[in-house]
């Protein structure tokens, strides 16, 4: 595995780094989307509940 890392060109490393960043960003966005969905559902329940 170390040999593979040594043999990578700077362009390949840059590409891999961008992929890693986009993967983390995608995971973060998915998490936030889930939180917003839950908050929205709670708001609807609170606003629509009649006593």
Swiss-Prot record:
What Pfam families does the annotation carry? Answer: DVL (PF08137)
Positions of the UniProt region annotated as Disordered: 1-25
Q: Upon deletion of the gene, what happens? A: No visible phenotype. Impaired developmental regulatory activity.
Q: Which UniProt keywords apply?
A: Cell membrane, Developmental protein, Membrane, Transmembrane, Transmembrane helix
Where is the protein situated, by its record's location annotation?
Cell membrane
GO terms classed as biological process: negative regulation of cell population proliferation; shoot system development; socket cell differentiation
Task: Give, from the UniProt record, the effect of changing residue 23 to E.
Answer: Impaired developmental regulatory activity
Q: Where is this region: Required for DVL/RTFL small polypeptide activity?
A: 20-51
Q: Tissue-wise, where is it found?
A: Mostly expressed in leaves and, to a lower extent, in roots and stems.
Membrane-crossing segments per the record: 28-44
Please list the residue ranges that the record marks as compositionally biased, kind Basic residues. 16-25
> InterPro entries from the entry?
DVL (IPR012552), DVL/RTFL_small_peptides (IPR052153)
GO-annotated cellular components = plasma membrane
Functional summary from the UniProt entry: Small polypeptide acting as a regulatory molecule which coordinates cellular responses required for differentiation, growth and development, including leaves shape, pedicule elongation, inflorescence organization and fruit maturation, probably by restricting polar cell proliferation in lateral organs and coordinating socket cell recruitment and differentiation at trichome sites.
Q: What is this protein called?
A: Small polypeptide DEVIL 1
């Amino acid at each position: 595995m170390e040999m593979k890392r040594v043999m990578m060109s700077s362009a390949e490393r840059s590409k891999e780094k961008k992929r890693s960043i986009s993967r983390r960003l995608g995971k973060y966005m998915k998490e936030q989307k889930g939180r917003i969905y839950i908050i929205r559902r709670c708001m609807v329940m609170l606003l629509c509940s009649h006593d």
